[in-house]
From Swiss-Prot:
Residues 19-26 are annotated as: G1. This is Elongation factor Tu. GTP binds at residues 19-26, 84-88, 139-142. Its EC number is 3.6.5.3. Residues 63-67 are annotated as: G2. Its main location: cytoplasm. It comes from Clavibacter michiganensis subsp. michiganensis (strain NCPPB 382).
Length: 397
């Protein structure tokens, strides 16, 4: 028997949980999965327990979620793919790849703590990587008896959202308890239902770039014995039918190949659509021929480049950025889509240095080519932390 076909009967929306590492993102994700499985049983709504979402063995020993977990569920209105984005500062790299996959996100803030430095960092990062919409789950609300404290925390979170140009005044803020909901406490089960109603109503149905030429950044590469090499990622735009020719662009010389199979959530598809997480089986391609950071594209639609002009905002010290200025010939990493590439910065004439908190134009020469177009966003990173974010304004070479 072949794999089940993936049914596209409802709008598909990519969401996720972001926020401080100890505020209960993974517990909340498990609670959403359980509550929906109980309330709307279906083939999609299968309960995922905490351990399976928090998977990957070496991470749980230290109590830190590193990898991104994908959980699938549906409400009566929509089908959701939910990424549990890691919260620890060391793993902001994954946050960048995770947050980039969201049409909207649930910001998890513990009512017992309120917004912390990491919460701020995540909201800032969500803005930089283009998460269009945030709403708030005030988790652990069962542990706060004083209604006034809950109101103060809500106010603080709204101010934080507004400070990063999210709609802090109107974003839904729902009091939840992931733990109590998992235990089946009726009051808190209802709050999870209320949270998902808010997600249905407030995260706009994404406008997919289906008519543009196909592009999917490679996040992971693996071998399926007897079938060949599979690359996974989220299709950014376009559609791709089985047996289409594609090019693998960036980092190495461009290669042409054919897609012989497409999967999503372990189900076979005839085509991949913009906005979906999928796996592509590539004909005659070896595991070592492809790497994270490359893109799979419609032939001829995108070209690799090393030199570009860009404009970037350099984070202030308070936002977790550098403590001192940088000068011409500064060599940070430029994070494009799913990978870091070292680049050398040349500053505009008359600009001696760039201070934390400044916005600047720059010329950049990367040490490896990246599939690039004007308008493409990037993060500037050093030693694993984000120190700036910008956009390609002009391709030079």
């Amino acid at each position: 028997m072949g794999k089940a076909k993936f049914e596209r009967t409802k709008p598909h929306v990519n969401i996720g949980t972001i926020g401080h590492v100890d505020h209960g993102k993974t517990t909340l994700t498990a609670a959403i999965s359980k509550v929906l499985a109980d309330k709307y049983p279906s083939a999609t709504n299968v309960q995922r327990d905490f351990a399976s979402i928090d998977s990957a063995p070496e991470e749980r020993q230290r109590g830190i979620t590193i990898n991104i977990s994908h959980v699938e569920y549906e409400t009566p209105k929509r089908h959701y793919a939910h990424v549990d984005a890691p919260g620890h500062a060391d793993y902001i790299k994954n946050m960048i790849t995770g947050a980039a996959q969201m049409d909207g996100a649930i910001l998890v803030v513990a009512a017992t703590d309120g917004p912390m430095a990491q919460t701020r960092e995540h909201v800032l990062l969500a803005k930089q990587v283009g998460v269009p919409y945030l709403l708030v789950a005030l988790n652990k609300s069962d542990m706060v008896d004083d209604e006034e404290i809950l109101e103060l925390v809500e106010l603080e979170v709204r101010e934080l959202l507004s400070s990063q140009d999210f709609d802090g005044d109107n974003a839904p803020v729902v009091q939840v308890s992931g733990l109590k909901a998992l235990e089946g406490d009726e009051k808190w089960v209802e709050q999870i239902v209320k949270l998902m109603d808010a997600v249905d109503e407030s995260i706009p149905e994404p406008v997919r770039d289906k008519d543009k030429p196909f592009l999917m950044p490679v996040e992971d590469v693996f071998t399926i014995t007897g079938r060949g090499t599979v690359v996974t990622g989220r299709a950014e735009r376009g559609t791709l039918a089985i047996n289409s020719d594609v090019e693998i662009v960036g980092i190495r010389p461009t290669v042409k190949t054919t897609v012989t199979g497409i999967e999503m959530f372990h189900k076979q598809l005839d085509e991949a659509w913009a906005g979906e997480n999928c796996g592509l089986l590539l004909r005659g391609t070896k595991r070592e021929d492809v790497e994270r950071g490359q893109v799979i594209v419609k032939p001829g639609s995108v070209t690799p480049h090393t030199d570009f002009e860009g404009t970037a905002y350099i984070l202030s010290k308070e936002e977790g950025g550098r403590h001192n200025p940088f000068y011409a010939n500064y060599r940070p990493q430029f994070y494009f889509r799913t990978t870091d590439v070292t680049g050398v910065i040349t500053l505009p004439e008359g600009t001696e240095m760039v201070m934390p908190g400044d916005t600047t134009d720059m010329n950049v020469a990367l040490i490896q080519p990246i599939a690039m177009e004007e308008g493409l966003g990037f993060a500037i990173r050093e030693g694993g932390r984000t120190v700036g974010a910008g956009t390609v304004t002009k391709i030079v070479k």
